[in-house]
Amino acid sequence: MSKLIVPQWPQPKGVAACSSTRIGGVSLPPYDSLNLGAHCGDNPDHVEENRKRLFAAGNLPSKPVWLEQVHGKDVLKLTGEPYASKRADASYSNTPGTVCAVMTADCLPVLFCNRAGTEVAAAHAGWRGLCAGVLEETVSCFADNPENILAWLGPAIGPRAFEVGGEVREAFMAVDAKASAAFIQHGDKYLADIYQLARQRLANVGVEQIFGGDRCTYTENETFFSYRRDKTTGRMASFIWLI
């Protein structure tokens, strides 16, 4: 059976959300087994079966709107097909039954909703998108005030495994000097805490109800795919929608 993660947060009645793991699919190594990514070399039939299993396990009301993620900061407002382009790293919806989704395999998935349960969003935040402002752009799509927005940080590479060069630290500090607290020197490189960086960015725009951020895709190899660990691997996905 497909194993799902259900966010532990004060979710409004009108909102549903879940995040997949690598457990419960049909894909063969190195995509074993619940790979949802059709772009990483897996058998397309296996990916389709995995998606069917996931949609059933998560009780999704419709097929998710899959994005063409490019490590940027653009947000696609889900108003119904057809879309001129799905090239974006976040999606927003205020329409019941429309599923926001992002794929990850180390990058940070962030799910959003407002306390009233009338708006939702999902963002893909790798370090480039996070630094460029994808979370801030997503928050700006909400009609509600930032203090009424909840954010859940899904499974990403943890602070003991995310080694980066000095240029990554410098890029974040150029935007916010407080970002230095999220980097620890590790030889001639740094260990970066993507969860802390996300919390800083969200707090800077008034979002302070932040949950999750306690898993590591890199070290929890039996539960999660990790691009940095395995290079050729599958993808998880995180979903949120209005009921």
UniProtKB/Swiss-Prot annotation:
> Does Cell division appear among the keywords?
no
Q: Provide a GO biological process annotation.
A: peptidoglycan metabolic process
The protein's matches in Pfam families, at most eight in alphabetical order, are given as: Cu-oxidase_4
Cofactor dependence is on: Cu(2+); Zn(2+)
Query: Which residues bind Zn(2+) per the record?
Result: H71, C107, H124
Q: Which Gene3D superfamilies match?
A: CNF1/YfiH-like putative cysteine hydrolases
Which is a Gene Ontology cellular component entry for this protein? outer membrane-bounded periplasmic space
Keywords of the record, alphabetical order, are: Copper, Hydrolase, Metal-binding, Oxidoreductase, Transferase, Zinc
Share the entry's pH-dependence remark. Optimum pH is 5.5-8.4. Maintains 80% activity at pH 5.0-9.0.
Looking up InterPro entries in the UniProt record yields: Cu_polyphenol_OxRdtase, Cu_polyphenol_OxRdtase_sf, Cytotoxic_necrot_fac-like_cat
Gene disruption: observed consequences = Cells lacking this gene are more sensitive to ampicillin, cephradine and cefoxitin than wild-type.
A Gene Ontology molecular function term for this protein is:
purine-nucleoside phosphorylase activity
Q: Which residues form a coiled coil?
A: none
Q: Does the keyword Transferase apply?
A: yes
User: Which reaction(s) are listed as its catalytic activity?
Assistant: adenosine + phosphate = alpha-D-ribose 1-phosphate + adenine; S-methyl-5'-thioadenosine + phosphate = 5-(methylsulfanyl)-alpha-D-ribose 1-phosphate + adenine; inosine + phosphate = alpha-D-ribose 1-phosphate + hypoxanthine; adenosine + H2O + H(+) = inosine + NH4(+)
Q: CDD domains annotated for this entry?
A: YfiH (cd16833)
Q: What does this protein do?
A: Purine nucleoside enzyme that catalyzes the phosphorolysis of adenosine and inosine nucleosides, yielding D-ribose 1-phosphate and the respective free bases, adenine and hypoxanthine. Also catalyzes the phosphorolysis of S-methyl-5'-thioadenosine into adenine and S-methyl-5-thio-alpha-D-ribose 1-phosphate. Also has adenosine deaminase activity. May also act as a polyphenol oxidase: able to oxidize syringaldazine and 2,2'-azino-bis(3-ethylbenzthiazoline-6-sulfonic acid) (ABTS) in vitro.
- Complexes and interactors: Homodimer.
**Family label:** Belongs to the purine nucleoside phosphorylase YfiH/LACC1 family.
Q: What is this protein called?
A: Purine nucleoside phosphorylase YfiH
Q: Which organism is it from?
A: Escherichia coli (strain K12)
